[in-house]
Amino acid sequence: MSLTELFNRHEFLARHIGPSDAERAEMLAAVGAPSIDALVDQTLPADIRLNRRLDLPSPQPEAEALAALKAVASKNVVNKSFIGLGYYPVLTPTVILRNVLENPGWYTAYTPYQAEIAQGRLEALLNFQQMVIDLTGLEMANASLLDEATAAAEAMAMAGRVSKSKSTRFFVDSRVLPQTLDVMKTRAKYFGFELVQGHPEEAGNGDYFGALFQYPGEAGDLLDLTPHIAAVKAKGGVVAVAADVMALVALKSPAEMGADIALGNTQRFGVPMGFGGPHAAYFAFKDEMKRSAPGRIIGVSIDAKGKTALRMALQTREQHIRREKANSNICTSQVLLANIAGLYAVYHGAEGVRRIAARIHRLAAIFAHAVKEAGGKLVFDRFFDTVQVDAPKADAIYAAALAAGYNLRRVGKTVLGVAFHEAATESDLAKLIELFTGKPADIAALDAAALDAIPAALKRESAILTHPVFNTHHSEHEMLRYMKKLENRDLAMNHSMISLGSCTMKLNATSEMIPITWPEFANMHPFAPREQTVGYLELIEGLQKQLKAITGFDAISMQPNSGAQGEYAGLLAISRYHESRGEAHRNICLIPQSAHGTNPATAQMMNMQVVVVKCDEAGNVDVADLKAKAEQHAANLAALMITYPSTHGVFEQGIKEICEIVHAHGGQVYMDGANLNAQVGLTRPADIGADVSHMNLHKTFCIPHGGGGPGMGPIGLKAHLAPFIANHVVAPVPGAVEGQTAVSAAPFGSASILPISYMYIAMMGAEGMKQATENALLSANYLATRLSEHFPVLYTGANGRVAHECIIDLRPLKAASGVTEVDVAKRLMDYGFHAPTMSFPVPGTLMIEPTESEPKAELDRFIAAMAAIRAEIDRVQSGAWPADNNPLVNAPHSKADIAGDWDRPYSREQGLFPLPYVLENKFWPSVNRIDDVYGDRNVVCSCPSTESYM
């Protein structure tokens, strides 16, 4: 071999793609294709094929890619940040950093739809909810939202649903975070709400259906909101308070002031700033509002043996069920970050977080006292952590601070803001005092003289974090073992394949993950001076260039921090485009009946009218019906939302014609990027005819699902839509038009996880990306071929091929045997597998997506499990096993089934170890089947007693 060959630039390709060359040959033989090229030709329509190489650089080996990205990261200047504005430096407990954030047992799991194999993550989320309930004083909380700004927008929408007021006006505190107001302006316009800004004292002067107050204010000032909340509620309004999570440790709770809803960012509980995210927003509310709340809610139920078990509660509120009638389009949220924040509270406990909050306040109070003592002027005297100083020499102080490695907040010409935080030290305090006063500080003397700056009426008196979980795990050994106990209850991809259709659970390679905790990326404030963020901007520009090459679009907006947010940003660009042409009346959105629930939910949020397009018997969009409806609504047609390949798992032959029909009638084509993993290197959405599309970086581009978030959903747009991307009021986005409001709190969404996708593309290169897609198609067709021996495959394309996923139809078996898709999903747990996507897009089916990363041996294990389950169904159907007492209806079996009486017509071995491979590496569900009905009839969304788990 030559030296060039020995320096293998394609080494990562073999790490990412599961099957070997020999195994691929076996799989091709099994599906009856002479080559991978022939299989692709049989699968994709010829008129959409990309017959050239993607314009991407040559692939880099892992070590080289890491070194190159480190060089980019090193261009960032990470000053000590005292900017505030919702983002603060933190001290992430290293035991949590290493064992959760950097642990695939936590970050490769999926949203806990299959609760029996997600009890650890669900307990961590319940802890998060309990933490939020304690801090806000409200009765219920959800398991996170995307960021504080979108949480505020969700609060406004929720107020509109539950308020008895007939007003369409919503009051916004003039002290609200600027990025929050920016996002609320975007949402309010399309909800038909009028935002009225003013000081809290003005809230009682008008008639409002709701109000949002900031606590403390964006400048740090403290105000008792009690009378202002009462004034709004007296007129039938619903009141939300956006509250700093660390401040709530020390301050009177929003509920004690009369708030109906409380929200905010939990970033300060151990999650790095990351140039804006990802972070978990919290969202708490009164019990009476629970059925109108957005987002996932974790609830307590019982399993088949009466044991306490956890699950996602009240799912009928959500987009995957209610579609355009859903409370929100929220899908992926921020589970991994919520878990970190909740575990931070578990590790520190009430006493620990009180000490941290008290230290932060003391630093601010000493600083304020020193400035006043030196003759300086404070903008206000009551604060928790942020001090604003009116300094005539503000320019000189700001410049000196920068030179000393400190970032302050500029407010106008003469005012500087200094926001203290957990990571601030005594030496930082001394240096800041010297910068503002011009003389060295005697910290001990100042400490003795400084007064508390929290008014007595606003000091917290109510208890927090009293549950035993927050008062037990304070030594590192105990914390380590508690987190390991939780991890062991969850099935993640470090155990087995998770073949969820439409979710693309592929490899999250270690080399891709390593950069996210580098301090150059992790510790950057999103509003840091641009000259300090050169490395981040180079990374983002590089990723945008990669994504343009892959999709064919002219512009990429990185702001949407989930797929649902990407949908919203895309429809927003379309609406703004129509408005710019004097066609604001265009509000009809055509959506195929097979679409994901977020599509109609998002269209509804944009005040569009959803018109459903039929699908034919083969699962394709009914082109005749589409044409008829496009003609019928031509005067008002705004858009078509379509997924490609379809949610039925096939490449529809008529996709170009579909796009042409919509364009001919004045509409724009929004392509949902959920299935982009079947396109990369073979075709491009922009070439097919899409005007805008979102890309799930947490699917196609390897960001892990985190157990339910984080995600990233940037959008690609053609040139005519590019001027209408989201901008940002605090940190303008390069290429965005001034005045366009935001969709997310941070200018580049969850920027700190973008290195994952950048690394993936850099290590794969053009040929590697294409091979990944080809292997995804091969694996799906291999599964479809092998499984068709046991179950009917519901949809195939023109040549009998599926795309990157396939749907097996369980309805005939259900009719014949009574065994349901739920029974099959639960039984798969006994075989060590997470179930595929259940009853979507067709009820009574399973949608299976293996991805390119799974080795043939894992695919074969899954096939063996499904074949064995089919044999079990046959035994039920034949009467050999009773319909109400068999391994399927009793699944999953837990460790509790090992011992005790066994009154079942099948052996214990059959129930617990149904195939030989299971015995070698058994994953145990920690509970038996959970009673969903009980959980929704008895809604409990806070931590139960420790004894209840016994």
Swiss-Prot record:
Enzyme class name: oxidoreductase
Record InterPro entries: GcvP, GDC-P_C, GDC-P_N, GDC_P, PyrdxlP-dep_Trfase, PyrdxlP-dep_Trfase_major, PyrdxlP-dep_Trfase_small
Modified residues (N6-(pyridoxal phosphate)lysine): 699
GO cellular component: cytosol; glycine cleavage complex
Keywords of this entry: Oxidoreductase, Pyridoxal phosphate
GO terms, biological process: glycine decarboxylation via glycine cleavage system
Annotated function: The glycine cleavage system catalyzes the degradation of glycine. The P protein binds the alpha-amino group of glycine through its pyridoxal phosphate cofactor; CO(2) is released and the remaining methylamine moiety is then transferred to the lipoamide cofactor of the H protein.
Coiled-coil region: none
EC number of this enzyme: 1.4.4.2
Subunit structure: The glycine cleavage system is composed of four proteins: P, T, L and H.
Catalytic activity: N(6)-[(R)-lipoyl]-L-lysyl-[glycine-cleavage complex H protein] + glycine + H(+) = N(6)-[(R)-S(8)-aminomethyldihydrolipoyl]-L-lysyl-[glycine-cleavage complex H protein] + CO2
Entry cofactors: pyridoxal 5'-phosphate
Gene Ontology terms, MF aspect: glycine binding; glycine dehydrogenase (decarboxylating) activity; pyridoxal phosphate binding
NCBIfam families: gcvP, PRK04366.1
Family statement drawn from the similarity comment of this UniProt entry: Belongs to the GcvP family.
Pfam families (UniProt xref): GcvP2_C, GDC-P
Protein name: Glycine dehydrogenase (decarboxylating)
